[in-house]
Every structure is written in structure tokens, then in C-alpha cells.
Amino acid sequence: ASYDGGAEAIAAAVAAHRRHGTTGTLVSLITADPDDMVTAIRGAVAAAGDDPRILGIHLEGPFLAESRRGAHDPGKLLAPDGAVLQRFLDAGAGLVRMVTVAPELPGGLGLVHALVDAGVHAAVGHSDAGYRDAAAAFAAGADIVTHAFNGMRPLHHRDPGIIAAAMDAGALLEVINDGV
């Protein structure tokens, strides 16, 4: 779930998760204008100060491939940009724990390095990366796949893509468990 409605909405969503057995969560924020994302990040920081079940923030965007964007607004997607990332990390006050990146984009691998250097999990997702680009991202320190098999090329014997690269690297595969 994405928590873009500010601290009150985040608190309500975390309470709903708690009622269903979730003991800890990352507040996931989706692609928006950078200023709006900074505002949302600050709202998540405020909510986390009041609730120890909020373990941090996951930025699922805006550094995503347009061709694999899913529900993300294509007009808000950005090329990987270290200065924009730094704004987000500064607003997160140490709570940004994970950022999803499409590593095949120009600057994508550099963003993976910047995330790893900042102690933030770099996740590969909403990406059209082939095996080589994905493997390079995992070699650079990316260690998670954002909702495996969704928003990426399918696993194919002639084009193994992100999933095979992640398995070769021992990366964590996050899945959407709707209906489970």
C-alpha cells in the first residue's frame, strides 16, 4: 500500500495493518512531484515518531522505467538524479530504508551506488532491465527486487532478466501477496 495522505492517513493505515497481524511496516510512497514527495516523506517521519511499528520509508519511485511504471504517473517519473535523491534522504531524517530504481536508466547504476553508500537498500523494480543491467545493479549492492514478477520482464530462457539476476545474486524477492 502507498501512504501518500500525510501523517494521519499513515497512522490509520498502519492501524489497519496491525489489526490484521502486521507488526512492522515500511511506509511506501509512490511517484509524485519531488516537492510533493518531500512533503510525504516528512509526513511519514512525523508518523514514525509516534509509532514504533513504522520501521522506515520505502520510496517506490520516481526513478522508474516508463515502460514498466504500472500505476505510477508517467508525467512524474524522473531520470535517476543524485541531487533529487539527496533531497529525499535529507527529508527522511535517516528513515528512508529502501528506494526502488530501474538500473538500466541513464544514471541508474550511479544511484544504486549512492544508495548503498548512504546505507539505504537499493531495490530493483518497475524496470525493463535485462539480465546484464540487473546483475550489474546487484553487483553494485542492490539487494531487493520490488514485487518480483510485476513491473518487469517475465523470466524467459533466452532473456532471463531481473529475476534470474536476483537469484544469482541471492537478493531478496519481495512479492505482492494479494489473495493469500
Kindly give the residue locations of the regions a language model identified.
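Di-metal (Zn2+ and/or Mg2+/Mn2+) metal-binding site signature of metallo-dependent hydrolases
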Residues: 1-7
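Charged helix-capping and loop-helix junction motifs
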Residues: 8-9, 40-43, 81-83, 157-163
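Divalent metal-dependent hydrolysis catalytic cores, especially in the metallo-beta-lactamase
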Residues: 11-40, 53-66, 92-106, 120-122, ...
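Short, small-residue-enriched loops and turns at beta-alpha junctions
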Residues: 33-34, 66, 72-75, 104-106, ...
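Conserved phosphate-binding/catalytic loop of the ribokinase/pfkB sugar-kinase fold
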Residues: 65-90
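Extended, charged catalytic domains and RNA/DNA-binding interfaces, predominantly
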Residues: 87, 96-103, 108-130, 134-152
